[in-house]
Amino acid sequence: SEKITVFQKGNFQVTEXSSHFV
């Protein structure tokens, strides 16, 4: 899966499996 960076609630959430960066 490609890493999708989503700007949500002032935090950067990267959807990769179940990995997320805050």
UniProtKB/Swiss-Prot annotation:
Pathway given for this chain reads: Porphyrin-containing compound metabolism; chlorophyll degradation
Q: What Enzyme Commission number(s) apply to this enzyme? A: 3.1.1.14
Q: Which domain of life is it from?
A: Eukaryota
**Keyword Transcription regulation on this protein?**
no
Is Protein transport one of the keywords UniProt gives this record?
A: no
Reactions the enzyme catalyzes: a chlorophyll + H2O = a chlorophyllide + phytol + H(+)
- Keywords of the record: Chlorophyll catabolism, Hydrolase
A GO MF annotation of the entry reads: chlorophyllase activity
pH dependence, entry free text: Optimum pH is 6.6-8.6 for chlorophyll a hydrolysis, and 6.6-7.6 for chlorophyll b hydrolysis.
GO annotations under biological process?
chlorophyll catabolic process
Described function: Catalyzes the hydrolysis of ester bond in chlorophyll to yield chlorophyllide and phytol.
Q: Which family does it belong to?
A: Belongs to the AB hydrolase superfamily. Lipase family.
Protein name from the UniProt record: Chlorophyllase type 1
Organism of origin: Chenopodium album (Fat hen)
Its taxonomic path starts at: Eukaryota, Viridiplantae, Streptophyta, Embryophyta, Tracheophyta
